Amino acid sequence: MTNRIMNKQTIITALLALLAMTGQGQTSFDPNGGCLNVVDFSFGQGIGEYGNNCVSANYLHEVFINEQFCIGGGIGYSHHKEYKFSAIPVYFSTHYFFLDNRFSPFANLRVGGFALFNAKNVGTNEKYSISKEKQGFSLYISPSIGIKMHITPNIGVLASVCDEAYLVNAFDNSRNDYRSKLIHSLGVNIGVCFQIKGW
């Protein structure tokens, strides 16, 4: 009986400590607390005729303009299942947090270019094949909407729905030739955001 009471007290104490910890989460970002750093992972399903399944990881570093808006840049890695290639996107990024609260919906836009490598389905003249010729400008664009939640004053989590699009020279079945195509994947993005003063 005594052990059961002690176990209940331990659980209640742990829950109260957790509640106190989460209750200290700030209601907004502090522009003087350092830049916004984000590490995230996304898993997407192909959409559209030329879409493909994509897995990616990214790091973003953004400067706060105010508590709700920040701009900066990022770099990532992605693997494309159907097209059988990998890419390293480098891009401009911006976040806008709609509310000055601990929980806030946000919008994120990433625009830049990418380096394509490790391509295996090249010049086969079939769907999901990419051209042997060197690509020109390689556009990368990824809009997303989601929600942010602070866990501590300097750490939070982000969850969003994103559309990752890459411009590639893909085989067009209807024209029997390679054409510039935006290949899309619609997915879920999960990340951690943090601020380190002076960084």
Give, region by region, the residue ranges found by the protein language model.
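Transmembrane beta-strand segments of Gram-negative outer membrane beta-barrel proteins
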Residues: S28-Q45, L186
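Gram-negative (and chloroplast) outer-membrane scaffold detector with strong preference
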Residues: F41, V55-S144, M149-I155, N189, ...
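Polar/charged side chains located within well-ordered beta-strands of beta-rich proteins
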Residues: N37-V39, Y59-H61, D163, H184
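Short glycine/proline-enriched turn or capping motifs at secondary-structure junctions
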Residues: K8, R179-I190
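C-terminal/domain-terminus segments
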Residues: L167-K181
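Bacterial Sec-dependent N-terminal signal peptides
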Residues: M1-P31, C35, I196-W199
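Outer-membrane beta-barrel domain signature
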Residues: D30, Q45-Y50, H79-Y83, I130-Q135, ...
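Conserved active-site loop/cleft motifs that coordinate metal ions or position small ligands
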Residues: G156-C162
